[in-house]
Amino acid sequence: MNTKKLKAAIIERGYNIGQFAEIIEMDRSKLYRRLSRNGNTFTIAEVLAIKAKLDLSPAEVVDIFLP
């Protein structure tokens, strides 16, 4: 997973990490932990929520979430 690209996508859309955590209904500390572990613990449901809330294209999802 490319956490730098995910963080960039969040910021490009005008959110900070804390705001985005609220939007995807995730505890802020949990999102920070996931990002600090290179996202290796995101569930499929969480990835889908992130995709939807950031309006990521299929190519962006692949680029961010797949090695």
Q: What are these regions, as identified by a protein language model?
A:
Residues A45-E60:
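DNA major-groove recognition helix of helix-turn-helix/homeodomain DNA-binding modules
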Residues I17, R28-S29, P58:
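The DNA-contacting recognition helix of HTH DNA-binding domains
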Residues M1-Y15, I23:
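A short, Lys/Arg-rich alpha-helix, primarily the initiator
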Residues K7, Y32-R33, V62:
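Key DNA-contacting residues within the recognition helix of helix-turn-helix
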Residues I11, E22, S36-R37, L66:
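Residue-level detection of the helix-turn-helix DNA-binding "recognition helix"
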Residues E60-P67:
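Short amphipathic recognition helices of helix-turn-helix/homeodomain-type DNA-binding modules
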Residues M26-T41:
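Recognition helix of helix-turn-helix/homeodomain-like DNA-binding domains
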